[in-house]
Design a protein with these regions (language model features):
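A short, structured surface patch at a secondary-structure boundary
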Residues: 46, 50, 64-119, 123-129, ...
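Stable alpha-helical elements in mature extracytoplasmic
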Residues: 62, 69-76, 82, 112, ...
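Extracytoplasmic substrate-binding proteins
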Residues: 56, 123, 131-207, 228-230, ...
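Short secondary-structure boundary segments
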Residues: 70, 128-129, 202-204, 231, ...
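Short helices/loops that flank or line small-molecule/ion binding pockets
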Residues: 113-121, 138-139, 237-247
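A ligand-binding cleft/hinge motif common to bilobed small-molecule-binding domains
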Residues: 130-138, 250-270
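Alpha-helical, coiled-coil/dimerization segments enriched in small aliphatic residues
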Residues: 92-95, 209-235
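Bacterial Sec-exported substrate-binding components of ABC uptake systems
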Residues: 2-5, 13-72, 167-199, 305-306
Length: 306
């Protein structure tokens, strides 16, 4: 069961209620039927948007000089064929490769405000939790604060970003392509994998991907059962004893995390570790799994192959 490969980004988790989501359930149910947060007709201005804080954002014209301060948002821009509009990114954005040449502008907690201002962006994309958002808005720089946590939220963010660049139709097409790929992955999950109890580790604290996260949503559609119920939060920090008591049948995480797990108190007793029923992923593959963006279809493929 153990697979260690950049080609296989896995994350098998889903809803604790076994059978509540069948592997064949259409992903389309999770796709927004309209463009929530968007009030825009192609070719018209201004563009009125609603961000993840519930705040209105008005753009006088489609954004042309964009700064992205979150890797998933960087990936969305490029998947919409607008990579050339990026003038700067956060330090963690590393896909697609062409973003490597762009100026690095810090991260969630330490964005470089002076450098951002000097680049004269007409739009900054940032996480809703980023400390820099209020400061940039005080400087009259338009900010879309977007931080999807669910599969449906990812679709909403993709369509909102597409509207911000003046091409909402491309956003809808991108989301349809993602959902189609997830559906295809769900159809080929082996029967032996469906319903398995899965633990997906996000960090060694340990933090896990809960059933209510975008990771959990994808895993539910693949027919997996998450040992971390939605009631515990999206990416909750767990008492390590929770994992030991839950006795997951499959454990998924980064290569580094899987190497460390047997050393944790009580974890050597986990049958999944003893029997190597694990999926460990190299950094590049793991990025695909934990970023709510255009590569979620690829993530579903990797999960189906775990």
């Amino acid at each position: 069961m153990q697979k260690v490969s950049v080609r296989m980004m896995a994350a098998m988790l889903a809803i604790v209620l076994a059978g509540s989501v069948a592997a064949a359930q259409p992903v389309r149910a999770a796709i927004p039927s309209a463009l929530p947060g968007v009030a825009f007709t192609p070719g018209t201005t201004p563009i009125d948007l609603i961000d993840d804080r519930g705040r209105p954002v008005r753009l006088a014209a489609p954004a042309r000089r964009i700064i992205s301060l979150l890797p998933s948002l960087t990936e969305i821009i490029c998947a919409l064929d607008a990579c050339e509009r990026l003038v700067g990114v956060d330090r963690f954005s590393n896909w697609p490769p062409q973003v490597d040449r762009l100026p690095r502008l810090g991260g969630l907690e330490d964005a470089l405000v002076e450098r951002i201002v000097a680049l004269k962006p007409d739009l900054v994309l940032a996480a809703a939790s980023a400390r820099v958002v209020d400061r940039l808005e005080a400087l009259r720089i338009p900010v879309l604060a977007l931080e999807p946590k669910t599969l449906e939220g990812t679709g909403r963010v993709i369509t909102t970003v597409a509207a911000a660049i003046g091409d909402p139709v491309a956003g809808a097409a991108q989301w349809r392509a993602i959902s189609t790929r997830i559906e295809a992955a769900a159809r080929r999950v082996p029967a032996s994998m469906r319903g398995q109890r899965v633990y997906f580790e996000v960090s060694s604290a340990p933090h896990a991907a809960g059933a209510g996260s975008f990771v959990g949503d994808v895993l539910a559609l693949l027919g997996m059962a998450n040992i971390v119920p939605a009631s515990m939060g999206v990416f909750p920090r767990l008492n390590p004893e929770h994992v030991v008591r839950a006795q997951p049948q499959l454990i998924i995480g980064s290569e580094a995390a899987l190497r460390d797990m047997p050393k944790r108190p009580g974890w050597a007793a986990l049958s999944a570790l003893r029997e190597r029923r694990t999926c460990a992923f190299a950094p590049a593959a793991y990025d695909v799994l934990v970023r709510p963006g255009p590569r979620l279809g690829e993530a579903a493929d990797l999960l189906a192959d775990c």
